Amino acid sequence: MYYSSGNYEAFARPRKPEGVDRKSAYIIGSGLAALTAACYLVRDGQMKGERVHVFEKDPLPGGACDGYKYDIGYVMRGGREMDNHFEVMWDLLRSIPSLETEGASVLDEYYWLNKADPNYSLCRATVNRGEDAHTDGKFGLSDKGAMEIMKLFFTPDEQLEDKKITDFFDDEVLNSNFWLYWRTMFAFENWHSALEMKLYLKRYIHHIGGLPDFTALRFTRYNQYESIILPMVTYLKDHGVQFYYDTKVVDVQFSLEPGKKQAVGITVDHKGAVETIDLTEDDLLFITNGGCVESCTVGAQNKATGFDPTIKPGNGWDLWKRIAALDDSFGHPEKFCSQPELTNWESATITTLDEKIPRYIQKICKRDPFSGRTVTGGIVTVKDSAWLLSWTLNRQQQFRAQPKDQLCVWVYGLFSDKPGDYVKKPMRDCTGREICMEWLYHLGVPVEDIAELAEHSANTVPVMMPYIDAFFMPRVKGDRPDIVPKDAVNFAFLGQFAETGRDTIFTTEYSMRTGMEAVYRLLNIDRGVPEVWGSTYDVRALVDASVKLRDGRKLTDMELPLMGRIALKEALKKIEGTDLEKFLRQYNAI
């Protein structure tokens, strides 16, 4: 496998891999990484769909990319923010037919939508019960804070292993708008991995200017299950791929010899009926190890989620622990799933039932939430919330079957263990109605109306996810297994806990990249995998980000010691009248 960039490789179709007709594939899980692997097996691997088998422990596909209507109401555990340079995602979705527009792909539909209705926020944060916090697009970083970020940016990965963000940032960064934007947009906590923070900075350096108002982001028309997962599953079923639901893979058997590691069997549990499937070297096994939504608990309007991080038999953590015990190259799951108090947060889906709540939403987001177009344009963070509450409305309806007079709001709190500001209980102990009350309080709803509106004008379903931030925990090389471990001949790891270079976790792109790389490696497909977008190597992006991170202040305005000021002055004299001077002026650096 090799990486590539540019249209030559992007538009090429690979030859059929040698020996693919005698191979079969077994995929554990049906999340985005697993479905991507299945799609690439069919599209570029040219494997017959009937020879691809997908095992899913739940009754529906999609993993964390959910969006369903249950008896208790609508549920979206999370949302997906997309980037125009998710190179693998767009490479695949250009081939997945739209379910709504004949002759169009999912990418076509997405591209047209975001051209016609570009994303941007009119209110990024609130304070004092619904007042605009007036972050005003500013990062609010001092020169010292900017230098702390720059230092992290240039620190070698090896020096960041097992380091926390607070090992590099002090209050100059942590009390700034920059950190407010960053931690709530990406769900970072202060104690999370400094290495992952650095990778994020380098990965999205071209979007620094678009973070304060979310112009950097793009969204699907509906929830991610209906907009992404269903089209992929339909494509796979149309090609004959076999899906097995309510089916847990509880163990994997390996033959581990010097120079050769082979998966030789999987133990499958379908509703209590257990069987072992033998695997040969021509049977390719794709393992989704770990899982950010494992052990989640769902509440209801009048039921709290509680907090139960127990790792249950047959889930992604249990399987990974069993596998990891066999060989050190299979990773170290305990680094990620041993401290659920440091990896959890809680979300809730609030469905409005009448016209009473939407007017408070419109007052803050300054848009008609029923227009079918962008509403909040990303999350609105309640800056003075004890739960650090954020909420968002994407284009409504978020579900195709959603009544047109209802809105689906997604809410999440980073601090599920802190008492609320209105409801004096931790979020994890609150019913859906009580979470809605806390949200309404921060919207500025009159206190005397809060209980009535939460009870009769909304239905709220909370979800506690003990391991939703597990991949952000500090780590060292080897804690996550390589996608295809050294000497592996017929198996690969998939998803957020498999290791690939330069890309960042908690994104659709990371999951899809692991799926593509796994297939390309095991089948030796002769076509380049799109490399991670290289803006970190683009001097234009670097200079532009340096200026915007300092809210437009020029390099000549930096607080420097005397010798630094003299050196800068002399350097500027040297470049006077050159293209370098023109370049720096073009990007307002001088």
Predicted regions, residues:
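Beta1-alpha1 glycine-rich phosphate/pyrophosphate-binding loop at the start
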Residues: 1-3, 37, 41, 45-84, ...
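Helical element adjacent to the flavin cofactor pocket in flavoenzyme catalytic cores
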Residues: 202-284, 288-290, 302-303, 308-317
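Short, glycine/acidic-rich hinge or "gate" loops at secondary-structure transitions
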Residues: 103-111, 245, 527-537
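Rossmann-like flavin
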Residues: 99-206, 217-219
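C-terminal segments that line or cap access tunnels to active or ligand-binding sites in enzymes
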Residues: 205-220, 282-284, 289-514, 520-534
